[in-house]
Amino acid sequence: PMTPEARTIWYKILVGKVPLRHFLRQIGRSTSSLCHLCTTSFEDTLHFLVGCPTKNDVWTSVLGYFFPHLHFSIDCLYTIMTTLTWPSTIWNPSHLLVVIGTTLRCIWNGHWQSSIHNVPFHRQLLVKRAIRGTLHILTPLPLDD
């Protein structure tokens, strides 16, 4: 199970329709092709999703919470998101997809709140939201008697 919003975001990734800064610049919605958060790197899809150090901190924290004995490199995360293939060390892929989908949604929302409304990209708040949202999806509801 994944939220409809997370599915929509993931669909945009899979079909190559992520609204990157260089595209937004071409249509007059941005003045720069640099990443809005780190302001030092050109924003391509890899950087937008996982390569930005600010966003990567969120990924590292959330994935470390749910998979403390595994390491996910930037390339590994990018491959999972763009091809829906995961490492053989993952024994429950649906669990991983929920974690990634929920975290992706939180980072996506944080990115656009920051970019459009000048709301600070608060990493720790996004980590908490991603963990809480993932646990909400993965924790079964108690059965009524």
Regions of interest found by a model, annotated:
Residues P1-D145:
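Family-specific functional microsites
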